[in-house]
């Protein structure tokens, strides 16, 4: 090894160039001595033990890390699943995505009120319709007869003995309802003082009686005329 501390090659330059085995004698090998050539030992380009030292240092550091991790208590590395579990009694109630408890309460209250309005039996519907027809203002013209609560002509209205008897004339109950024969009905909410549900029910009932009204009118037993505007 030279004074600068660099490592020399094991074979001389002449033997290495000829690719023969060198006796590695210094300062001159036996082959160079026999041939009378200059025997030189060049500096090697490989780092040698320096790379080996780096590998050993890396292994030592990894071993040290493993040893330090092994000495740490297990509870500090990962939490105990039993200690972090939330009791079922303390968990908040589940709600669908995009909803809040307040919105659910409002929706349930609206649904209950709507369900209660549609849960009336058929007999209660008939009583409500009769009461509505009784208290509803019945418009009359100058030539029309007064109607009683049942929709017929009152007995107190007597015509003159000289005037000919006229056939009874039916007047519309709701001003917005046109002639039944035309099958036209108002939208819910157009009749004042009436709930949309009741108007919808009246429209359905009137639609079912159109066919019967046409049959009676063709037989000459029912005369329907338009109300005076």
Swiss-Prot record:
Feature: DNA-binding region: 12-39
Annotated Gene Ontology cellular component terms: nucleus
Single GO BP term: positive regulation of metabolic process
Record's compositionally biased regions (Polar residues): 51-71, 153-164
Subcellular localization: Nucleus
SUPFAM superfamilies the record matches: Zn2/Cys6 DNA-binding domain (SSF57701)
InterPro entries from the UniProt entry: OAF3, Zn2-C6_fun-type_DNA-bd_sf, Zn2Cys6_DnaBD
Primary location recorded for the protein, binned into one broad class: nucleus
Xref: PROSITE patterns: ZN2_CY6_FUNGAL_1, ZN2_CY6_FUNGAL_2
Annotated segments matching region Disordered: 50-100, 141-169
Key words of the record: DNA-binding, Metal-binding, Nucleus, Transcription, Transcription regulation, Zinc
GO terms, molecular function: DNA binding; DNA-binding transcription factor activity, RNA polymerase II-specific; zinc ion binding
Job description of the protein: Transcription factor that regulates the expression of the gene cluster that mediates the biosynthesis of geodin, an intermediate in the biosynthesis of other natural products.
PANTHER family per record: MONODICTYPHENONE CLUSTER TRANSCRIPTION FACTOR-RELATED (PTHR31069:SF31), OLEATE-ACTIVATED TRANSCRIPTION FACTOR 1-RELATED (PTHR31069)
Protein name: Geodin cluster transcription factor
Organism of this sequence: Aspergillus terreus (strain NIH 2624 / FGSC A1156)
Gene: gedR
């Amino acid at each position: 090894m030279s004074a600068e501390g660099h490592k020399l090659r094991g074979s001389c330059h002449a033997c290495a160039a000829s690719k023969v085995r060198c006796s590695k004698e210094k300062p001159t090998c036996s082959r160079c001595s026999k041939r009378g050539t200059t025997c030189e030992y060049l500096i090697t380009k490989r780092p040698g033990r320096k790379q080996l030292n780096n590998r050993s240092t890396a292994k030592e550091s990894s071993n040290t890390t493993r040893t330090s991790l092994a000495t740490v208590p297990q509870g500090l590395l990962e939490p105990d699943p039993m200690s972090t579990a939330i009791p079922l009694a303390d968990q908040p109630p589940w709600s669908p995505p995009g909803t809040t408890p307040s919105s659910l309460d409002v929706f349930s209250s609206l649904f209950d009120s709507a369900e209660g309005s549609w849960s009336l039996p058929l007999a209660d519907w008939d009583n409500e319709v009769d009461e509505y027809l009784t208290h509803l203002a019945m418009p009359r013209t100058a030539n029309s007869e007064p109607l009683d609560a049942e929709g017929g002509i009152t007995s107190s209205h007597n015509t003159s003995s000289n005037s000919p008897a006229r056939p009874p004339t039916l007047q519309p109950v709701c001003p917005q309802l046109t002639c039944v024969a035309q099958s036209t009905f108002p939208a819910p909410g157009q009749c004042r003082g009436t709930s949309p549900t009741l108007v919808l029910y009246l429209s359905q009932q009137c639609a079912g009686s159109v066919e019967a009204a046409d049959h009676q009118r063709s037989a000459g037993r029912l005369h329907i005329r338009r109300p005076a505007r």
